[in-house]
């Protein structure tokens, strides 16, 4: 599934808000002339999301899903809009619809795991994260997400293992190394944390950005 076919960038620096609104107006007129055009409606909805017009985006995805109830891109981004509107149960329902038609879809599994965590459904979040790792064992992000859930639940050793697995699959991701440092500090394994911090500086992360973590290691 090309679920990122309507890829959204929330950096609107390239276009002013006025330009985005003008583009929306043009696409709205074109969509009125071609009501069955999914492409036009997806483009308009993506611009609505860029402007954080969650309700307008949701309504546009509603229009698409009325015609094509199983359109995965519309379901995914409507769920995204629902999340921003804090309508979490509706967001989860849309993600679940994607998984019903495309079992194991990485983006939907990831979204459901994070959404369950946001909803304080910790057991469901961890179950979903386990499923994510089992079905996508090559994805660094799958391990990192599970590690974050484990860390939040106080499962620190398990979190450390998963951060290490994420790093094995994406060794240049500085965030994973930073999360590993924080986890090592929580485990009071300060020497290992310092070694990881030194590695981060060699990777090009400014020492000033790591100052607080260095301080925590030295205040043991």
Regions found by a protein language model. Give the residues of each.
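Terminal, low-structured helical/coil segments at or just beyond the last alpha-helical repeat
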Residues: 18-21, 186-220
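Canonical positions in the second alpha-helix
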Residues: 30, 63-64, 97-98, 131-132, ...
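Structural marker of alpha-solenoid helical repeat scaffolds
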Residues: 33-34, 67, 101-102, 135, ...
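Helix-start (N-cap) detector for alpha-helical repeat units in TPR-like alpha-solenoids
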Residues: 38-39, 72-73, 106-107, 140-141, ...
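Register position in tetratricopeptide repeats
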Residues: 50, 84-85, 118-119, 152-153, ...
């Amino acid at each position: 599934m090309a679920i990122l076919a309507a890829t959204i960038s929330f950096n609107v620096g390239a276009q002013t808000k006025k330009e985005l609104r003008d583009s929306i107006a043009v696409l709205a007129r074109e969509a009125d002339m071609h009501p069955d055009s999914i492409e036009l409606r997806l483009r308009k909805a993506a611009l609505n999301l860029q402007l954080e017009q969650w309700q307008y985006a949701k309504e546009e995805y509603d229009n698409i899903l009325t015609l094509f109830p199983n359109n995965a891109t519309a379901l995914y981004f409507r769920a995204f809009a629902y999340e921003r509107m804090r309508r979490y149960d509706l967001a989860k329902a849309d993600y679940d619809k994607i998984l019903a038609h495309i079992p194991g879809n990485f983006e939907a599994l990831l979204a459901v795991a994070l959404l369950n965590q946001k909803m304080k459904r910790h057991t469901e979040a961890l179950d979903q994260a386990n499923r994510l790792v089992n079905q996508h064992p090559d994805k660094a992000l799958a391990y990192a997400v599970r590690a974050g859930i484990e860390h939040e639940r106080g499962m620190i050793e398990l979190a450390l293992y998963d951060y290490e697995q994420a790093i094995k699959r994406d060794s240049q991701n500085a965030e994973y190394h930073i999360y590993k440092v924080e986890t090592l500090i929580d485990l009071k394994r300060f020497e290992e944390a310092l070694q990881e911090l030194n590695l981060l500086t060699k990777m090009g992360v400014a020492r000033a950005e790591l100052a607080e973590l260095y301080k925590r290691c030295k205040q043991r």
